[in-house]
């Protein structure tokens, strides 16, 4: 099994409201769209969302929902890479939203600054 498969039963889908933390409707829609895509297809999917809409939370949530064995995230810059690595290694946004319990252990995260050129390196 994988971290995301093992942790999936603890994943929740709270909807944000005025008085309660949760995932925003656009985030829930994107998570469900990603899951629906992979029910019938095995080719890559693309999630497009505006800046500030919570793409990183969707990215991490999708790994849980899809029970991913391994996740490769390619970032366009060092700053974005560092932000995403921090978010994945703490699961802070999903915990704040109530999608995961505060005591949920985080996955192992490895960042690389160079190209991975062999299966062994992967």
State the predicted function of each range.
Residues 1-122:
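N-terminal helicase ATP-binding lobe
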């Amino acid at each position: 099994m994988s971290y995301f498969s093992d942790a999936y039963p603890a994943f929740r889908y709270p909807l944000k409201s005025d008085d309660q933390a949760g995932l925003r409707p656009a985030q829930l829609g994107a998570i469900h769209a990603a899951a629906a895509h992979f029910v019938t297809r095995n080719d890559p999917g693309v999630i497009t969302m505006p800046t500030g809409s919570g793409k990183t939370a969707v990215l991490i949530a999708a790994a849980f929902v899809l029970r991913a064995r391994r996740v490769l995230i390619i970032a366009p810059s060092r700053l974005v890479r560092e932000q995403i690595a921090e978010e994945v290694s703490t699961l802070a946004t999903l915990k704040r939203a109530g999608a995961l319990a505060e005591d949920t252990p985080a996955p192992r995260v490895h960042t690389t600054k160079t190209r991975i050129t062999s299966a062994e390196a992967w």
